[in-house]
Regions:
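A glycine- and charged-residue-rich anion-binding loop/surface
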Residues: 1-869
Length: 869
């Protein structure tokens, strides 16, 4: 049975038992900030287990793609460790329980995939007599095949927990130890765990007591790759048809053979495992970066590249492996087929970036380890680890792995200290425009009905805060945070800035600089008392800056139109990576791996303006998040959403989850103009644009610029491009003539320069100062002198303003006699207050003291003499 057939058999079996069969959830957790990535079958179903959300069915079955990197160093070194794997699972939310879970597991293993009953063993929790009796009395498993283990209890702190029962397959005594009592739970490889059945029946309280749950749940997990290895009679998961084709392709590329060398096998397995993780992560929207999920991806990808180098692969090699992963898994994980081309572009880009620095980084690390070894050291200093990370892109874990292979440990504390220093410098170097405003405790307002209503004209002050302290009254000049019972101010969110305006009380006025939301959703106002005073329980009125909000509404709706246009023109791989909506302009960050061409930008602009000209009425609805996703609504990556969401759509063009301000009709936007496009990171581009009055002002400014240029070149506006091109062509021709004149003048100076040539032993040398204006001319002059003498070394200096430049060139034959241009210019430059260096045959440097030219050239001459003499 193939791995794909096994997956389908499992899902079909549990579907026949009344389970809703669902495709794997994304590796990126949906609205769960406690998880970086999905690492188990039950993880995306957690809201159903906790009761936060109602499941679509009380029985669900999945084959959940999962990522775990906690023991990444073991991948390739054992038969079972992976960063990426699939977890087969069947789940019950207050429906069936222990007996059914055990019976169905046994039925699937023995009747569907027909495993040998004699080779199946189980473990149960010592106090779980019900599970023991079910296995022994109902299934008929002999007592010798059932073990009671204290470890068979699943819990993570407070909350739902319960005993579990693990199912093992006996791989045979030849895979085990010599202990005659060997059984499941032994550290040897004989008994392979293939399935874990968790019976969630208790709630652990804060006091550590266990209370029975009113609704008991079932959570099971069976590793697809493990089960496949048993069915296909393979010694490791890597040799199953789910992974081995990748190993074969990599071995062919590297010119090596699997199972002939242990270290070679490790690298082949690492690459095969990691490329599966890479494909799945990128297809789910994760891009390489230095933080969070992106760092996990970058670390995995660069580790794979490094193991390619260990196999002798020098160039890029990962992209063709993407196709193999898609061929194997695409039938079950459909989004990797849809995103296949995009995944390959991301992999190619990241692999190329790392390859540019990998060789240099490995050389530096090798030299560092040699030096440390010679000094008798056993720890790599944290500063050096940080330099490898900062300069060569080495994740510290990669440096740690290489160092460990050479017998060294890593100064992790020193590395983290250097990282923190860099973060501090970066933080201090930029203005923290997103700084959080300290807010007082609002738990005492829990019984108040606090709401947002853009039509509200009056309300009551519930709380005034000064920093983290609640106060009863604020006077003129005080900076405050204010919470009112009902507010018309729109809070920051989804990239849109908060509203500004005034809160007016009976005795004073507060200028509102922005509105923000607390984590639980309450809107608070950040402002300054500008007249009189404001007090708790004051009845207040509002004056929102409506014109400013309208400008933001234009830009926010235009952002939605831009997003849809980008996906239409560039491809569905485009996803929002960030946005900023201000009254003056909009900024949109999106995933794409090449500059957007001028033609594409024009097409995108035209598409957005076409929607504006259509004057479509926006549709705004509130619905369940599942209904919104079913309609194709796009969600902002990383944004938290409740069970009910607001959906904003432009009919037949755009549909997104959004809580921001929008125009009622696209025609109100006026017009849309893109002002800039550029890259801001690996695979992320940024577009800035303007709408409405700002777009009109830009058009008028550009029109006036064209008219001004037309007047300068004495042409009509429509003739400006051709006329300016004529001027540029003429200027280039004049520039070429000037260059030729300079070369002729320099050539005329050759005789004077050559007059100062001398010999040291059998090496001809020329050391001289020449009257040229820049480094380019100096190099040209040195070229001519070297060509003229045929064999030898040339050192030329040129003073200009408050600096001096040096160039040294040597023919190959004299380099073989000991001449090194890098050391020659270094000596000259240091004599003139500078520094520099370079290759043995060519080098350049600079100095700060033109008056020291003679001493500098003399120092260079002495260096030449010492090299030959």
């Amino acid at each position: 049975m193939t791995g794909n057939e096994l997956r389908q058999a499992y899902l079909n079996f549990f579907e026949s038992k009344g389970h809703l069969k669902q495709e794997s959830y994304s590796l990126v957790p949906d609205n769960d900030p406690s998880l970086l990535l999905i690492g188990a079958g039950m993880a995306p179903l957690k809201p159903f287990f906790t009761g936060k959300l109602v499941p679509p069915c009380t029985r669900i079955t999945t084959s959940q793609k999962s990522i775990r990197t906690g023991d990444i160093e073991n991948v390739g070194r054992t038969a079972r460790h992976h960063t990426f794997f699939e977890m087969l699972g069947n789940f019950s939310f207050g429906d069936y329980f222990k007996k059914e879970a055990i019976h169905w597991a046994w039925e699937f293993l023995t009747e569907v995939i027909k495993l040998d009953k004699e080779k199946l063993y189980v473990t149960v929790y010592p106090d779980d007599q019900e599970a023991y009796d079910t296995w022994h009395n109902e299934i008929g498993l002999p007592e010798s095949h059932i073990s009671r283990l204290e470890d068979n209890f699943w819990e993570i702190g407070e909350g739902p927990c319960g005993p579990d029962s693990e199912i093992f397959y006996d791989l045979g005594p030849e895979r085990g130890c010599d202990d005659p009592n060997c059984a499941p739970g032994c550290d040897c490889d004989r008994f392979l765990e293939i399935w874990n059945l968790v019976f969630t029946q208790f709630n652990r309280t804060a006091e550590g007591t266990y209370e029975p749950l009113a609704k008991k749940n079932i959570d099971t997990g069976a590793g697809l790759e493990r089960l496949a290895s048993v069915l296909q009679n393979k010694e490791s998961n890597f040799e199953t048809d789910l992974i081995f084709p990748i190993i074969e392709a990599t071995a062919k590329k590297a010119g090596v053979t699997y199972h002939t060398d242990a270290s070679t096998d490790i690298s082949l397995k690492v690459i095969a495992d990691h490329i599966r993780a890479i494909v799945a992560l990128i297809a789910d929207g994760v891009l390489p970066s230095n933080e969070g999920r992106g760092y996990v991806l970058r670390r995995i990808l660069r580790r794979a590249v490094r193991h390619g180098r260990l196999l002798g692969i020098q160039g890029p090699f990962l992209v063709p492996l993407v196709d193999i992963v898609v061929d194997i898994l695409g039938g079950a994980i459909t989004n990797i087929v849809e995103k296949q081309d995009f995944v390959k572009r991301v992999v190619a880009n990241e692999e190329e970036r790392f390859n540019q620095t990998l060789a240099s980084g490995l050389d530096m690390l090798s030299q560092l380890l040699d030096t440390l070894k010679a000094d008798g050291a056993t720890t790599v200093p944290g500063q050096d680890v940080f330099k490898l990370y900062d300069t060569y892109g080495f994740p510290w874990e990669l440096t740690e792995e290489i160092a460990h292979e050479a017998g060294f440990t890593i100064d992790q504390a020193g590395f983290e200290s250097a990282m923190n220093e860099q973060r501090t410098r970066a933080r201090e170097a930029r203005e923290d425009v997103d700084a959080k405003v300290a807010t007082p405790d609002i738990t005492h307002l829990s019984n108040e009905h606090i709401s947002d209503d853009e039509s509200a004209t009056a309300s009551t002050v519930l709380l005034i805060g000064e920093g983290a302290k609640a106060i009863d009254r604020a006077e003129d000049g005080q900076d405050v945070t204010i919470i009112v019972k009902t507010t018309p101010f729109h809070a920051e969110g989804g990239g849109q800035l908060g509203d500004t305006g005034f809160i007016v009380g009976p005795l004073g006025k507060v200028e509102v600089h922005t509105a923000k939301k607390l984590p639980e959703g309450t809107t608070y106002h950040v402002g300054t008392v500008v007249e009189g005073s404001i007090s708790v329980n004051d009845e207040v009125t509002f004056a929102v800056d409506v014109e400013r909000r309208q400008h933001m509404a234009r830009n926010h709706t235009a952002t939605h139109l831009l997003h849809a246009a980008l996906r239409s023109v560039l491809g569905t791989h485009v996803n929002q990576a960030g946005s900023l909506v201000t009254p003056d302009y909009l900024r949109f960050d999106f995933t794409h791996f090449s500059p957007v061409t001028a033609e594409e930008l024009q097409t995108i602009t035209n598409m957005v303006n076409e929607q504006i000209l259509r004057a479509s009425t926006l549709e705004v609805e509130t619905m369940s998040i599942d209904a919104a996703k079913a309609q194709g609504a796009m969600a902002l990556f990383g944004e938290k959403y409740g069970s009910e969401v607001r959906v904003v759509s432009v009919p037949e063009f755009s549909i997104e989850l959004c809580g921001g301000s929008h125009v009622e009709n696209t025609g109100f936007i006026g017009q849309f103009r893109i002002t800039s496009e550029g890259g801001i990171g690996s695979g992320v581009r940024r577009i800035e644009a303007v709408t409405g009055k700002a777009a009109l002002a830009l058009a008028q400014q550009e029109e006036q610029t064209v008219k001004s240029v037309a007047a300068l070149v004495k042409a009509k506006p429509q003739e400006v491009v051709g006329k300016v091109q004529q001027v540029l062509d003429h200027a280039k021709a004049v520039e070429r003539e000037l260059e030729q004149v300079k070369k002729e003048l320099n050539s005329g100076n050759l005789d004077g320069v050559l007059a100062g040539q001398f010999t040291v032993g059998d090496v001809t040398a020329v050391v001289a100062s020449v009257p040229v204006s820049d480094m380019g001319e100096l190099r040209d002059m040195a070229d001519m002198v070297r060509d003229k003498i045929g064999s030898g070394v040339v050192l030329l200096g040129a003073a200009g303003g408050d600096k001096v430049n040096f160039v040294c060139m040597a023919t190959k034959d004299v380099v073989g006699k000991g001449i090194h241009c890098g050391n020659i210019v270094k000596a000259a430059a240091q004599a003139a207050g500078g520094n520099g260096g370079g290759r043995p045959d060519m080098a350049q440097a600079g100095g700060k003291d033109p008056a020291a030219m003679d001493q500098a050239l003399a120092a260079g001459k002495e260096t030449i003499q010492s090299m030959v003499g």
